[in-house]
Amino acid sequence: MKASELRDLTVEELEKKVEELNQELFNLKFQLATGQLENSARLPQTRRDIARVHTVLRQKRS
């Protein structure tokens, strides 16, 4: 997910996106703990996506 794509979204859509990504991160951590995670690279990728959304949210609120 690119920051340029995120800048086109509204604040409400960005907040919803953060919730979705946090839920996905929780599920990935759970899969990792139970040994079911096939692609471990998705964990840092999801964390970075959350950080990108937070950055764009802060920019829009300023």
Swiss-Prot record:
Belongs to the universal ribosomal protein uL29 family. This is Large ribosomal subunit protein uL29. One of its GO terms (molecular function) is structural constituent of ribosome. Keywords: Ribonucleoprotein, Ribosomal protein. PANTHER family: 60S RIBOSOMAL PROTEIN L35/50S RIBOSOMAL PROTEIN L29, LARGE RIBOSOMAL SUBUNIT PROTEIN UL29C. One of its GO terms (biological process) is translation. CDD domains: Ribosomal_L29_HIP. NCBIfam families: L29. GO terms for cellular component: cytosolic large ribosomal subunit.
